[in-house]
Amino acid sequence: MQILPAIDIKDGQAVRLFKGDFNQKTVVNPDIIEQAKTFKNAGIQFIHLVDLDGTLDGRATNRDLITEVKKISGLGIEVGGGIRTLEQIRDYLAVGIDRIIIGSMAVKDPDFVRAALEEFGADRIVVGIDAKAGLVATEGWLETSNVDYITLAKEMEKMGVTLFIYTDVDRDGTLTGPNLDHYKCLVSELTTAKVIASGGVAELADLNHLQEIGVAGTIVGKAYYNGNITLDQLKSFGG
């Protein structure tokens, strides 16, 4: 199981939110570049990077900063937040970003996902499914659709998506443990596509449980920044 430390960017700083609430923001490192270097120096190979400003603006707000992170750190990076156009994806891939996460647009315009898969390939496109009580949330988690997370995942898999990031918004940033039942259901319902878990990880035991379920990777944020899980422990899972 791959471990992906998370860096969420808001106003140029690394932050953590509580249940996706922008009003409950904690700055964990004011220097994004320094945080990326910390991961790199610890032997981490791949990170999960979210442009929180972009989720609200609907554009690549922190594109220049993200480009600098890639250039200086040399880390493998997947980027999400505000991805609305193929041109944005082209731009990110051109500067070396490894994977692009499509979130809201998977619900609002499935043809956009199809076009992205056709142009860039399934190894470069990840669909991020964020859900509240099992229903898909969009627009930086500010809106909730009537689409069930399993239904969306199965539709996207038929389209050719091979990797999903599933976030239980109600667990994100809470340190209450991941929603294991949701991950069990999602892994069992998908035919060949893989799942990366996100939201709620609090301790090392949570990573062991997720590995047993069969997720391909897990994103770790607050548990690391709070000191619950060390970088050495993350590395032991193949981070």
Swiss-Prot record:
Catalytic residues in the record? D8 (proton acceptor), D130 (proton donor)
> Which GO MF terms are attached to this record?
1-(5-phosphoribosyl)-5-[(5-phosphoribosylamino)methylideneamino]imidazole-4-carboxamide isomerase activity
According to UniProt, the reaction catalysed is: 1-(5-phospho-beta-D-ribosyl)-5-[(5-phospho-beta-D-ribosylamino)methylideneamino]imidazole-4-carboxamide = 5-[(5-phospho-1-deoxy-D-ribulos-1-ylimino)methylamino]-1-(5-phospho-beta-D-ribosyl)imidazole-4-carboxamide
Q: Where in the cell is it found?
A: Cytoplasm
Q: In which pathway does it act?
A: Amino-acid biosynthesis; L-histidine biosynthesis; L-histidine from 5-phospho-alpha-D-ribose 1-diphosphate: step 4/9
In the UniProt record, does the keyword Isomerase occur? yes
Write down the EC number. Answer: 5.3.1.16
- Annotated GO biological process: L-histidine biosynthetic process; L-tryptophan biosynthetic process
Q: What class of enzyme is it?
A: isomerase
Q: Which GO terms describe its cellular component?
A: cytoplasm
Q: Which Pfam family name is an example for this entry?
A: His_biosynth
Matching SUPFAM superfamilies: Ribulose-phoshate binding barrel
Keywords tagged on the record:
Amino-acid biosynthesis, Cytoplasm, Histidine biosynthesis, Isomerase
Q: Mainly localized where?
A: cytoplasm
Q: Which family does it belong to?
A: Belongs to the HisA/HisF family.
Which NCBIfam families did the record assign?
1-(5-phosphoribosyl)-5-[(5-phosphoribosylamino)methylideneamino]imidazole-4-carboxamide isomerase
Name of protein: 1-(5-phosphoribosyl)-5-[(5-phosphoribosylamino)methylideneamino] imidazole-4-carboxamide isomerase
